[in-house]
Amino acid sequence: MPLKVDLNADMGESFGAYKLGLDRELLNLVTSANIACGFHAGDYMVMQKTVNMAASKNVAVGAHPGFPDLQGFGRRNMQLSPEEVRNLVIYQIGALQPFARAEGTELKHVKPHGALYNMAAVNYELAKAIAEAVKKTVPDAILLALANSEMVKAANDVGIRVTQEVFADRAYNEDGTLVPRSMPGAVIDDPLQATERALEMVLEGKVTAINGKEIPIVAHSICVHGDNPKAVELASSIRKQLEKAHVEVVELTYVLKAAYS
């Protein structure tokens, strides 16, 4: 059976007069779209438009909840209790879900954004709060979680489906976490380098950390950040080379079926 992997991108991150990302172009390349829900980015007009575009391209629609931090784009840590995190995720899923249904689709997955994602990757209680929010609102949806993280453990404990995500356009620490964006070399915008890393993770099950050490990794889904100026080039190159290597690029549901069949 050929390998299968999902290709996802964060999108719907414009709001009001502010435009961000190349959503329309990316939707021709990705299989899953993580759509901002109004807290770190996005608004009701952008949410509807992005869901509509994704549904028309048969791209899986997912919620991308973040901290309530428009000014910081959800990339600044906030000290919230697990209960607060659970409820802010429920709130944002609830905001996006009707738009999906109005466009004839359903939320297929949930992926936390930015600082919320990174904090939950290493904090089990926050990770569990997110998993519980998914179970209470969209129990059939898949949690998209950093590979080998606390989110994967929490999802399994709570009893929801989970897929392990890797990043072609980000550098890794030795412990499998992402290098902070404030550090040199944290963001990768060279299509060749990003593609080589994606192939290494999918085909060889490993990634080279920023200190040169190889670490094992599980790659169910590859993320390309929509706000990366070279996102379209990266996604196009990655998809082309994956398919050349006989890897099927499909949405998360099919990746899970293949991984556990």
Swiss-Prot record:
It is an enzyme of class 3 (hydrolase). Keywords: ATP-binding, Hydrolase, Nucleotide-binding. It catalyses: 5-oxo-L-proline + ATP + 2 H2O = L-glutamate + ADP + phosphate + H(+). InterPro entries: Glyco_hydro/deAcase_b/a-brl, LamB/YcsF/PxpA-like. It comes from the Bacteria. One of its GO terms (biological process) is carbohydrate metabolic process. Its EC number is 3.5.2.9. Gene3D superfamilies: Glycoside hydrolase/deacetylase (3.20.20.370). GO terms for molecular function: 5-oxoprolinase (ATP-hydrolyzing) activity; ATP binding. PANTHER family: 5-OXOPROLINASE SUBUNIT A (PTHR30292:SF0), UNCHARACTERIZED PROTEIN YBGL-RELATED (PTHR30292). HAMAP family: PxpA. Catalyzes the cleavage of 5-oxoproline to form L-glutamate coupled to the hydrolysis of ATP to ADP and inorganic phosphate. Belongs to the LamB/PxpA family. Forms a complex composed of PxpA, PxpB and PxpC. This is 5-oxoprolinase subunit A. It comes from Coprothermobacter proteolyticus (strain ATCC 35245 / DSM 5265 / OCM 4 / BT).
